[in-house]
Design a protein with these regions (language model features):
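Beta-alpha junction/loop-to-helix N-cap segments that form part of ligand/metal-binding clefts
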Residues: 129-133, 147-210
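Short beta-strand elements in bilobed, periplasmic/extracellular small-molecule ligand-binding domains
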Residues: 144-159, 214-218, 265-286
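Periplasmic-binding protein-like
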Residues: 173-185, 202-205, 244-248, 297-317, ...
Length: 454
């Protein structure tokens, strides 16, 4: 298995699976089970087009199992696909001992979700955030009812009146709750993350820093780090390799820059300059320092540094509104700017948008698609859902859609849910990660950009 681990670390999932499959006839008991789980994790991470194996060896069997499960839509379809595959391959190691995630899928299919607890604060600093999340969550619930889907019942619990988490879980169990959505408060999510286990599967609506928590805890939020990684992916897909960066002074800016830098450098990109935005009066000088204007001997116009191919920007709309005109003024108007969604106020303020023409930014599908039928329904009732609060409505809708699918996302690591807050997948540490869509300010309007190949 040492060789298999080395191949896996090198990103060669198929070769690692082949190596482990060759070992399986000689293994029994726990060793066989953990080898099966490792093979499943490797083949399940491959895209469907790589799973069309020819032949009847052990590895081909694993690949046909992964393809069968991935091709099925609902939990019940997946169950049928697994049962059918086992009937066709009765002597295969995976038929004799199903990998643990598939055993869990079987359990999930036999326990339909009938009751969800929504644990959110009704008072305090987060009350307005909480209300947007709750309204989005319930909008998705009513939509499921209208579609005749017989959705689970929802029971509300107020986290701003919690005496203790233990007491809450005792009450929820007594009420017959099978899944908790919430809490939102970071300190409560941290407490849950530090526990060895939870009595009920829980989808927290925030992230705790640090290590992986108990097996029953999943975490979902609008992390700025997801957006920083998204910028790195997009710029790389657009063929760029050398970045400058501007982020706000402080802990938030540091976190976002770190996430961008890690994703960017992991794939061979370099960061050639960084400025931390502080006071508006210093901005012009900071932009000048970053683009390093130089006087040219014969030419009357100075030129910017040429080793910087684009600028990664994490900033408020007000800051972005100053930065783009300043770049133009500093003879760096041709420097592409890739930004997080924080530059987009979604206020409809044409003057503000005009100052940002040319900035590309990642954003939730919710705010980029005004014609989405659910968005039209929701904004008719809550007009503020069309503005920057819309991201939270979208997250509430996605929390509802994620609720019954957590086990599937965990069992099938590369599966995705196309949500309103982004395209959602599950990390190995059970955090929901978002990939976003792209737009560019053009003629004072955000215009959708086509997706890239990757």
């Amino acid at each position: 298995t040492v060789h298999a681990r080395a191949l896996e670390a090198d990103g060669q999932a198929l070769a690692a699976a082949r190596e482990r499959a060759a070992l399986s006839p000689n293994l029994t008991g726990d060793a066989a089970n953990s080898n099966n789980d490792a093979i499943w994790a490797l083949v399940a991470s491959l895209p469907a087009e790589q799973l069309h194996a020819q032949g009847n060896d052990v590895l081909s069997g694993w690949m046909s199992l992964a393809l069968a499960v991935k091709s099925a839509g609902t939990l019940q379809d997946q169950q049928n696909a697994i049962d059918q595959w086992r009937a066709q391959n009765p002597a295969h190691p995976a038929a004799i001992q199903l990998p643990t995630p598939l055993v869990k899928l079987k359990e999930l299919a036999s326990q339909p979700l009938t009751k969800i607890a929504l644990l959110l604060p009704q008072d305090g600093q987060l009350a307005s955030v909480s209300k947007a999340l709750r309204d989005g969550f319930m909008a998705a619930h009513y939509q499921a009812q209208q579609a005749g889907q017989n959705p689970p019942s929802i029971q509300f619990y107020d986290s701003s009146r919690l005496t203790s988490l233990d007491e809450f879980y005792r009450q929820a169990q007594a009420d017959g709750v099978q899944l908790v959505v919430g809490p939102l408060e970071k300190n409560l999510v941290k407490q849950l993350n530090s526990r060895p286990q939870l009595p009920i599967t829980t989808l927290a609506l925030n992230y705790s820093e640090g290590t992986q928590g108990p097996a029953q805890l999943f975490q979902f939020g609008l992390a700025a780090e997801d957006e920083a990684r998204e910028v790195a992916r997009r710029a790389r897909a657009d063929g760029l390799t050398r970045a400058g960066a501007m982020v706000p002074v402080g802990e938030w800016g540091d976190r976002v820059l770190k996430a961008f830098r890690q994703e960017w450098e992991a794939h061979g990109g370099t960061v050639v300059g960084v400025e931390h935005i502080d006071k508006p009066v210093a901005l012009a000088q900071q932009v000048a320092d970053l683009v390093q204007l130089r006087k040219n001997g014969g030419s009357s116009e100075p030129t910017r540094r040429q080793d910087m191919q684009f600028l990664f920007l994490a900033a408020t709309p007000q800051q972005a509104q100053q930065i783009k005109p300043t770049l133009n003024y500093q003879y760096a108007g041709d420097l592409p700017v890739y930004a997080t969604s924080h530059v987009f106020s979604a206020s409809g303020d044409q003057n503000q948008y005009n100052d940002m023409n040319g900035i590309r930014f990642c954003e939730t599908p919710w705010l980029l698609d005004p014609n989405n039928p659910l968005r039209q329904q929701v904004t008719a009732q809550w007009p503020q859902a069309g503005g920057s609060l819309g991201r939270l409505y979208a997250m509430g809708i996605d929390a509802y859609r994620l609720a019954p699918s957590l086990g599937q996302l965990k069992a099938l690591p590369d599966s995705r849910i196309d949500g309103m807050s982004g395209s959602l997948s599950m990390s190995p540490t059970q955090r929901v990660e978002r990939q976003l869509q792209w737009a560019e300010f053009a003629n004072g309007q955000p215009q959708r950009l086509p997706a890239t190949a990757n």
